[in-house]
């Protein structure tokens, strides 16, 4: 290939003159032409504009919307309206004054023949109880405990009735102090009367059970 780049020597020159190189052949046989760096790239044939290349940060993917936002509200959780639901009726029996005073007055009549003066004071105390009950000055707990006290009194449970009396004096002394003294005295008088009646019954039954010595009742 060297002979392609060397021109034949000039016949007029000497034998030792250097050969002349042919630069035209080098450009003809050289590699492929390089595209000049200043040449612009042709626009695409379809006519669509090219998106400008930006060097900003990549777009951030937003999370999908929460499914709670589109979920319908559960049944029964409707927004509260201005109308309040009707309140449930209170199932509670009212303690009647007759259920308390009538047994107390009956117990008072049973004791009146024994201690009249004491029973007169008890009667005045029971009148105060009646007045405060009708006047709405007694609370519901006091009324309920008095109903229990009367039931224990009717069943001759003296100790239990006395315990209820003491609890009322401790917990509600302001309400019951004016008339509870009479109730306490009535419990004591009723207990004493019951004890005397029991003794009389025992003394009456004893002679009937006695037998005459040496006498056998006929069968």
Curated annotation (Swiss-Prot):
- Which controlled-vocabulary keywords does the entry list? Activator, Apoptosis, Cytoplasm, Nucleus, Phosphoprotein, Receptor, Ribonucleoprotein, Transcription, Transcription regulation
The reply to whether Secreted figures as a keyword in the UniProt entry is no
Tissues expressing this chain = Expressed in various prostate cancer cell lines.
For the region Disordered, what residue ranges are annotated? 1-90, 192-219
Q: Provide the positions where the record notes the PTM Phosphoserine.
A: 48
In terms of one coarse class, where is the protein primarily found? nucleus
Q: Which organism is it from?
A: Rattus norvegicus (Rat)
One GO MF term on file is: steroid receptor RNA activator RNA binding
Record-stated family: Belongs to the SRA1 family.
In which residue ranges is the amino acid composition biased (Basic and acidic residues)? 192-203
Protein name (database record) = Steroid receptor RNA activator 1
Other facts: Appears to be the first example of a new class of functional RNAs also able to encode a protein. Rat SRAP1 may act as a protein rather than an RNA transcript.
Q: Where is the composition biased (Polar residues)?
A: 23-32, 206-219
InterPro entries, alphabetized: SRA1/Sec31 (IPR009917), Steroid_recept_RNA_1 (IPR040243)
GO BP of this protein: apoptotic process; negative regulation of myoblast differentiation
Q: What GO CC terms are in its UniProt record?
A: cytoplasm; nucleus
Compartment(s) of residence: Nucleus; Cytoplasm
UniProt gene name: Sra1
Function of the molecule:
Functional RNA which acts as a transcriptional coactivator that selectively enhances steroid receptor-mediated transactivation ligand-independently through a mechanism involving the modulating N-terminal domain (AF-1) of steroid receptors. Also mediates transcriptional coactivation of steroid receptors ligand-dependently through the steroid-binding domain (AF-2). Enhances cellular proliferation and differentiation and promotes apoptosis in vivo. May play a role in tumorigenesis.
Q: Name one Pfam family in it.
A: SRA1
**Can you state the subunit structure given in the record?**
SRA1 RNA exists in a ribonucleoprotein complex containing NCOA1. The RNA also forms a complex with PUS1 and RARG in the nucleus. Interacts with AR.
Q: Where is the composition biased (Pro residues)?
A: 55-76
């Amino acid at each position: 290939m060297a002979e392609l780049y060397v021109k034949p020597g000039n016949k007029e020159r000497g034998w030792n003159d250097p050969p002349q190189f042919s630069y035209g052949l080098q450009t003809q046989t050289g590699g492929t032409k390089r595209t000049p760096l200043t040449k612009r790239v042709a626009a695409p044939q379809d006519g669509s504009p090219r998106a400008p290349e930006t060097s900003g940060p990549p777009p951030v993917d937003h999370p999908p919307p929460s499914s709670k936002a589109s979920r319908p509200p559960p049944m029964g959780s409707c927004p509260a309206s201005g109308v309040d639901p009707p309140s449930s009726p209170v199932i509670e029996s009212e303690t009647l004054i007759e259920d308390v005073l009538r047994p107390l007055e009956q117990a008072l009549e049973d004791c009146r023949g024994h201690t009249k003066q004491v029973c007169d004071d008890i009667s005045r105390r029971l009148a105060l109880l009646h007045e405060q009950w009708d006047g709405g000055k007694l609370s519901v707990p006091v009324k309920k405990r008095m109903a229990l006290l009367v039931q224990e009194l009717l069943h001759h449970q003296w100790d239990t009735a006395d315990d209820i009396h003491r609890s009322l004096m401790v917990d509600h002394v302001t309400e019951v102090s004016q008339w509870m003294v009479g109730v306490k005295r009535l419990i004591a008088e009723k207990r004493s009367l019951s004890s005397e009646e029991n003794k009389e019954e025992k003394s009456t039954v004893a002679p009937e059970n006695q037998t005459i010595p040496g006498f056998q009742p006929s069968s």
